[in-house]
Amino acid sequence: MTQLLRPEAVENLLGEVPNWKLRENSIERTFKFSGFQEAIDFVNRVAQEAESMNHHPDIDIRWNKVKLVLSTHSAGGLTNNDFMLATKVDKLA
C-alpha cells in the first residue's frame, strides 16, 4: 500500500503545484476552458495519464469547467502519487 504523506510533506509539495488547493484529505483544482469540447478533450488527456499511472482522479465536468480531486482512496488520504498526477495534469492544461 502507498504511504500517506505527513502534513509537513503535504505543505511542501503544495508549493510545487500552486494552483491546487488542499481540501481535508485531497487536493483539487478547477480548470476553465472556452467550451464543452475543449473541456472534454482535456478530460480525455487526463484519463490517459491517469490510466498510465493507475491513479484515477474524481472528475466533475460543468460545460466549460473541469474540477479534479486527487486523493489515494486506498491509503485514506494524500500520497506522492496525488502530487505526481497533479504535476502531470498541470502540463496537460
Give the label of every model feature segment.
Residues 1-36:
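N-terminal first-folded block
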Residues 19-22, 47-57:
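Short arginine-rich
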Residues 35, 46, 63-65, 72-74:
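Short glycine-rich, polar/acidic loop-and-turn segments at beta strand-coil junctions
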Residues 39:
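Flexible nucleotide-interacting loop at or near the entrance of a catalytic core
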Residues 42-46, 83-86:
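Short amphipathic alpha-helices in soluble, non-transmembrane regions
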Residues 52-61, 67-71:
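Mid-chain, well-packed structural core segment of small domains
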Residues 67-92:
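C-terminal structural segments of small proteins and small subunits
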